[in-house]
A protein has these predicted regions:
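Class II aminoacyl-tRNA synthetase catalytic cores and aaRS-like
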Residues: 1-497
């Protein structure tokens, strides 16, 4: 039924009346208290959320707390006024004087707002309406309080942003709450911000090394029509424009290999991958990965490149080729020198050492099943000897490795995109790098034979058809590219996070 203009207006008025009758959104007493302060500031003509660059006619730069402290600690402090902005950590009202402690990254600066310098009204506005967590901008000069604390003596102040929630500076420790409120976590635990800076340093170091070695950085699609490049469960979506089901990429590998076929030369991508699997301390549903491919290289050369990459990143972060190592929690690890050559050992040799007996992919299947049961390793239908060997390796070797170690020559059964080992049947030219019990990355001598690749992807698609949510699908476009001819290639993948 089509409503007339009058009926539409009547409906709108009824909706508005209904909204007005709804109870106010439930807010804490603290938030209600702060909202009243916000309204009072606006009523007095002070905007609680001003736009940047609205500090009047002054052209002086706005300093952070750390910048101001650095100036105040110098031998020759300028006589001129400063403009400093910061978040209020604490407030102390002493009648005609208000002391505000501003905080930035764990460092604090005392601000003195005194009636004789700012005037009665600005002091009253501050005393009655400022709360901890508010961000204020203060203009003033260097001075010292009666107890000789370096201070900014205010001549004027303005709101930069009103905080409607109290910040639990002394009590925000619950891990789940910290994950839910990341902005609050960063405010209360500013050391966490250092992780972002370290991440940036790592990414810059990775790029610098790859660029120096002649790699081309590219971007490949994130929305895929066929999921592949790794064995993992994808996120699924739908594109309305084309009426097609799509998946978020689980790896950029197959697109990067298309570029190698097309003559790109050495190529790499730093980007986000998505896997619809469990989440824990070492696995996130979305994560950043470096993948790189070098024509005419193999897994040995990619291993050497990976060692250079991580050592460069360590140098950028720690100022030396060192890494925090240890089996305990990350906070208890000890930074140790890793500048020497890293250990290289085959999966089967390492597993045999852990078991005290020789085990490999040729070991009797029933013996492997018994070993899996003995060590609490779950085996499900469809697993062959290679898959059991890799599961045993993960439980008995990888989890107990602290020092940087390259474990090489994995079972071919679990490495569908890797080339067969050139001298050992049943194995693939693949390695995993393990540090502190975690896989940090892997590399292959890439499988360039399109006929073998088709067989392996067909096997994977049959597993997918039988309900294996992690199995890859047959990507005909990728296979066509491979059939065009891909040069011998080495490829690596590193988890940046």
């Amino acid at each position: 039924q089509v409503l007339s203009a009058g009926e539409l207006e009547a409906l709108r008025q009824m909706q508005l009346a209904t909204v007005e009758e709804l109870p106010e959104v439930s807010r804490s007493d603290q938030t209600q208290h702060r909202l009243r302060h916000l309204e009072a500031l606006r009523a007095a003509g002070m905007e609680p959320y001003p736009l940047g660059g609205s500090l009047g006619s002054t052209s002086a730069p706005v300093l952070g707390v750390k910048d101001a402290l650095r100036i105040f600690s110098s031998e020759n402090i300028p006589d001129s006024e400063f403009i400093v902005s910061g978040r209020i950590r604490a407030l102390r009202n002493h009648g005609g004087v208000l002391f505000a402690t501003l905080i930035e990254g764990g460092e604090t600066l005392q601000v003195v707002i005194e009636r004789s310098l700012v005037g009665e009204r600005p002091l009253s506005l501050a005393s009655c309406n400022l709360d901890t967590g508010d961000i204020i901008t203060v203009q003033g000069s260097y001075g010292a309080s009666r107890n000789d604390t370096d201070s900014l003596i205010a001549t004027s102040w303005h709101m930069a942003s009103k905080s409607l929630h109290p910040i639990p500076f002394d009590s925000f420790t619950d891990p789940e709450a910290r994950l839910r409120r990341r902005s609050t976590d960063l405010l209360v635990h500013p050391d966490q911000m250092q992780n972002l800076r370290l991440r940036t340093a790592v990414i810059k170091a990775l790029r610098a090394r790859l660029d120096a070695e002649g790699f081309l950085e590219v971007e490949t699609p994130i929305l895929h029509t066929v999921h592949g490049g790794a064995s993992a469960r994808p996120f699924r979506t739908y594109i309305n424009a084309y009426g097609e089901d799509l998946t978020l990429r689980i790896a950029p590998e197959l697109y990067l290999k298309r570029l190698v076929v097309g003559g790109s030369g050495p190529v790499y991508e730093l980007g986000r991958d998505f896997r619809n699997e469990g989440a824990d301390a070492t696995h996130n549903p979305e994560f950043t990965v470096l993948e790189a491919y070098r024509p005419y290289a193999d897994y040995v050369q990619m291993r050497e490149l990976t060692e250079r990459l991580i050592k460069d990143a360590a140098q950028a972060v720690f100022g030396s080729v060192s890494l925090p190592l240890g089996r305990k929690a990350s906070s208890e690890r000890v930074v140790r020198d890793v500048s020497g050559p890293w250990r290289v050992v085959s999966v089967c040799d390492a597993l045999s050492e852990a078991l005290g007996r020789r085990v490999d992919v040729q070991t009797d299947f029933e013996e492997l099943l018994a070993l899996a049961q003995q060590h609490g390793v779950r085996v499900h239908e469809g697993m062959g000897p290679g898959a059991i060997v890799e599961e045993l390796y993960g439980e008995l070797v990888e989890a107990h490795t602290v020092e940087p170690t390259f474990y090489t020559d994995f079972p071919a059964e679990t490495s569908p995109l890797a080339a067969p080992h050139r001298s050992v049947p049943g194995l693939a030219e693949r390695w995993d790098l393990v540090i502190n019990g975690m896989e940090m990355g892997c590399a292959y001598s890439e499988l360039a034979d399109p006929l073998v690749q088709r067989e392996r992807l067909t096997e994977q698609s049959l597993k997918a058809a039988s309900g294996d949510l992690e199995a890859m699908e047959v990507d005909e476009d990728f296979l066509y590219a491979l059939e065009t001819g891909m040069p011998p290639t080495g490829g690596l993948g590193l988890g940046v996070d």
